[in-house]
């Protein structure tokens, strides 16, 4: 009877499938994403929204030095979750691809074309020895021909388009919020509030200075970073909404108990 190769053998090599058809190193890369900061992306009727909780762990860190949202082109922006160094490499590649498209074809690259190019790079790192997968997920969003696009890429190179989605450690909770609250007809302003509401459910305290947020509106088609002052106003509105929901829940519970 042929002896099975120990699991550790499949564990060490990126190019070898386990008997169950799994690539363990890709799964470990996904685990790096699951431990990363939470990012939320939302398509709205008049644009797109990205928001990330930067999860600052020390008072000594200069918050302005921690970037989680990156402008790729005038009309494309990306949010990252996972290994920071891997993010830097892929963001640089994405920017180069966008520049090359303008030089070669005289026009801006589409959001979908850019997302596919990044996924091709990720996928290649799951097939060749001497390298490891990127421990990184990306939300790539922008405006294409008057319509918003939002793509999620994972370490395997898989690409999925969403109306609203989340990546990182708070994904399960954030997705529950998005599935229950998302409306295709919401405006960018409403999308910003929903994004921060989703993030508030994934952390004990949502601090405005720790939030990185960007929007792109159909009207201007340009990436716009949101200031801390504006984020603070939205966070305040979010917590007022949360407080009202908690009071309503307590009231309903009291009525049920009295019955």
From Swiss-Prot:
PROSITE patterns: PROTEASOME_ALPHA_1 (PS00388), PROTEASOME_ALPHA_2 (PS51475). GO terms for biological process: proteasomal protein catabolic process; ubiquitin-dependent protein catabolic process. The formation of the proteasomal ATPase PAN-20S proteasome complex, via the docking of the C-termini of PAN into the intersubunit pockets in the alpha-rings, triggers opening of the gate for substrate entry. Interconversion between the open-gate and close-gate conformations leads to a dynamic regulation of the 20S proteasome proteolysis activity. It comes from the Archaea. The keyword Cytoplasm applies. It is found in: Cytoplasm. Belongs to the peptidase T1A family. Component of the proteasome core, a large protease complex with broad specificity involved in protein degradation. This is Proteasome subunit alpha.
